[in-house]
Amino acid sequence: MNYLHTQRYNISFIIFVLMLIPTACDEDREHPVPYVHVRFDFNIIHYNLAGPGSSHQFSVDESGGYRGIIVHRLSMDEFRAFDRACPCDPHNCKVSIDPDNQLLATDPCCESVFLLIDGTIVEGDAQFPLREYQATFNPATNRLRITN
């Protein structure tokens, strides 16, 4: 009798765990912007990245990424780099720096707005932030390396 009780408990526990798996997977959805290898190195003097708060966007031909890259300078030594592909429709739409506010990037397709400090969604239909790349700055040479 005790053996039967243990078996029922084990089966109930297994069913409970299996019911939790789809919920847990839903939390970790894959980012819609495809992963592409990025290795881009440039001298910031040649672009509009002279001071904190400045931003520059590169085409995919210049920099790589899936749809190009936007670089934002946070401070004298800290930069952020994001793919220009919009998470709403990465195959057809790309974000651009807002000409009135270089802290923002906008997508004309879904009208989403993203903060270039960290790539988060400010407004719009986007469900994911911008895909971020690693930005490493060498102040001795004024070179910025963007990788993933």
Indicate where each model-derived feature is located:
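Non-globular, low-complexity intrinsically disordered regions
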Residues: 110-111
